[in-house]
C-alpha cells in the first residue's frame, strides 16, 4: 500500500517535471527565432544593445527616454534574448500603473507573433480579482477556499497546458471552471511563468513581497525591469514607513473589554504611553526613544495572536466583525514592529496630529535607498527606466 502511494506520488510529480523540461526547450527555441517587430527608430538599437550588455554583465542601468520612444519593447526584447542565452530564467516587469501592465502584456503578445514562446502572468491585487463581495480568505466566508488545495493542481495543469498568456480574464475563467481562488491561482501560476508583470510591492514591500522567489536562500536567476522608476523613491518611503494612531488603541479596547481582559489591559498600556507622548507634542515632536512603547507593542502583538488562535472562524463566542477588526489591527502593529527593526540613521521617528485631530506616531523612512538596493540584489540585473529620471544622482 505504501509502495503504491509512493509510486503514484512520483508519477504525479514526473508529469510536472516532464512538462517543465519540454516547455523550457520550446521557450528557448522560440526566443532564438524571435525578431524585433519593427524597424529600429533612431537610437532604439543602441538602447536595446545597452540593456543587453547591462544584463550580460549583471549590472544596473538607469534609462531616461521620452514617452513614445518604445522603452517597453526596448527593454523586454533584450531581456528575453538574455533568457534565451541562459543568462537568466525569469523576467519580472514591475510597474505602479494598470495601464503600463497592459502595455507590457501587449508587448509580449506582439513578440509571440515574432516567434516568441513565453508563459506570462499579470498579478492582480487580491481585492480586485476576488470573486466574493468581501475579501475574507477562509473556508467559512469563501466557497472557493473550501477544498482549494484539493483542486488547484488540476486547475494549474489544465491552464498551463492550454495557454501561454495568463491574463486576469483567463485566470478568472479557469478559476471558475475548477472552483479555486483566482488570486492564489495567479500566485501559483507565477512559478510556471517566464515573465511576471506586477506592482512594485511584489518585490519591494517588506510584507507582501513574493517569498517564493525573494526569500533568503531562493535562487536569484531573475531580471528586473522597473517601469516609471521615478515613482519608486516615494513608493519606497511609503512601504518602509509605518504609522500607528492612538485613537485606534482606544477604539479596539472598548470592543474587546467584555471578551478578553488581558488584551484590554495591553491596549490600555500602549494607549497610556502614547498619551504621554501626546502631552508633550504641540504640532509635531521628534521621538528619540520609544523602546518602552515597542516593548508594550510586542506584548500586545503576542496577545492578539493568542486571541486570533482562540477565536477562529468557527468560534461563535466572538463575532466575525470583531475578529476581523482585531486581525486588521494586528497587521498594523506587525507592520510597525517590522519597520522598527529596520530603523537606522535614514529614519526619523516623530509624533504629530492628523488633520482630523487624531494623535499619531510615525516611523518615517527619509531615504529608502538601502532597502530598495537590498531588494534589487535579489535579481541578477535591474533596468530602471522612465521619461523623467533627472537629476540622475538623486535616483542612484
Regions of interest found by a model, annotated:
Residues 2-12, 16-35, 87-196, 201-204, ...:
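A substrate-engagement module of RecA-like helicase motors
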Residues 19-64:
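Conserved pre-motif I regulatory segment
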Residues 52-53, 72-87, 107-111:
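Walker A/P-loop NTP-binding motif
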Residues 56-61, 89, 380-381:
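Pre-Walker A (Motif I) flank of P-loop NTPase domains
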Residues 56-78:
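Walker A/P-loop
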Residues 92-94, 196-199, 223-226, 381-386:
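Structural recognition of the conserved hydrophobic beta-strand(s) that form the central parallel beta-sheet
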Residues 171-196, 207-215, 307-396:
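A contiguous, basic/glycine-rich beta-loop/short-helix subdomain that forms a polymer-engagement track
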Residues 196, 201-203, 218-251:
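SF2 helicase catalytic motif II
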